Amino acid sequence: MRYDGGRSPARSISVVELIATGTLDAELAGLLWLLVEARLPMIVAAAAPRTGKSTLLEALLAFLPAGTRRQELSGFAEDFVWLPEAAELGWQGGRDADDRLRDRPATAERVTRADPASTYLVAPELSDHLPTYTWGEQARVAVRAASRGYGLGATIHADSLGEVFALLGGPEVGLTAEELSRLGLVLVLRLVPGGGRRLAAGHYVRPVVRDAGGHIQRLGPAVLATWDPVRDALDHFWWGILPELAERTSRRAGDFEAEQARRASYLAGLVAGGLTGWQEVVAAIAGYRASDPAGAR
């Protein structure tokens, strides 16, 4: 399906409402807007149930550009028939995509091949708890797809970046360190006293790259922001890797910084104006892009 601002469930919570309730702030949301718009992979992690992982993921997916194909994974039943690179990415489902497409029942929904330049994979949860969740070989192929340019949004039960790495790098999924470096954004969500939710830490996982001589260059993950429980506020550190983040959006560092500030201010204005409804926020995001096409890529 083409992305039109979200699934619109009965009670969707917008990113502006999450800012208003303190889950994250406008500065981090403005940064994530730029990075999600560039289709960076994004994992939302939380250890406790009902913390709001899916709520945060869906709210941030509203930042995907118009025309993005959102490809929901089908859990244990996922066959990647729509993914041309599936076999190259290690899918052991047997034959190539042409054979699998040809053998689908005539009554099956028409399958359109995915294009990495415009497709964002979505896994409601990375785990083996339910058949609708994504785990094992399916999870491995989905993360590997990020190396081919596909976006990926998912949630996972984990309380830290280290736990995310341990789960996805463990024997059941079996991702290598280089493959884990494609996770992009890892956002850790926690419950706080009183029943609130806070984005406790935001990480940018730097992809392994090779220099001109073919040598592997590994840089550790960078912290974008962390929550200070004393002040009940986020401390921001993303400016320390500003050039790297700007490069992911094909912008110069100065342009990226200015655009992040504009978007953060815009979101703060929506909070101040009480514009928090899902459809209102989706329309406001579209309106921002329409009024400033140079700032929305």
What is each PLM-predicted segment?
Residues M1-P41:
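P-loop NTP-binding catalytic core
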Residues I19, L152-T155, A272:
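Generic amphipathic alpha-helical segments used as scaffolds and interaction surfaces in large
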Residues G30, E58, S181, V209-G214:
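Short alpha-helical basic/polar micro-motif
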Residues R39-P49, L57-L191:
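Switch/coupling sub-region of P-loop NTPases
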Residues L185-V271:
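Conserved P-loop NTPase
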Residues E259-R297:
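Terminal-proximal interaction/regulatory segments of ATP-powered molecular machines
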